[in-house]
Amino acid sequence: MPRSATTGPVVPPVTADDVALAVRLAAELLRGAPEAGWGGKAGSLSWDCWETAEHLANDLLYYAVQLGPQTPPLDTHVPIALSRRRPDGPTVFIHADRDAGPAGLVQVLEACGALLVAMVRTTPSHVRAHHAAGVADPEGFAALALQETLVHMHDLAEGLGLAWTPPSDLCSRVLARLFPEAPDGADPWPTLLWATGRAALPGRPRLITWRSDSTARS
């Protein structure tokens, strides 16, 4: 059965500490990746591993930017110009310096994560800002950051030949905040992979389309 705000288990909110932990675990794992693997495909994505990590860093920075203005936009993005380096690549507004290698890319990821952590810690809970998945509060952006970090690290781990199993409590908080209709009963990590179209669950085929809901709950 789906998770319920009234009958389901009580799950703590997503916090800045959760984002900091997820980014730290991601960076630690990526530092051990073989350098030759970064040009290979990232799991089921059409992007390579470098592009996927760069996309993740941009996501984290984008969430921080959305919370930054004195009056954050509720119906659009903060107007930073976007670009892509190839037609099928991710659309981003910052690029890591390729000459700095994978170590530099991981630093960019850490820096973008740190900026979001700071914004989530310091932005009042009543603040709202636009996201395509729903106008979100700081906790909503923290949850989106967890989703992106945990799931794209799955893509990267597949592409780089690494093992990635994030803490169950982080997965539970993402599911409760962004995927309240996700089924109970399975481990949180496989359920999050199912909810984001990465894997099947027993009796539930892999999703072709999916959507998270970052709408502020109050």
Q: Language-model segments: which ranges?
A:
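Acidic catalytic motifs of isoprenoid enzymes
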Residues: 90-94
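Glycine-rich loop at the start of a catalytic domain that most often binds anionic cofactors/ligands
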Residues: 55-56
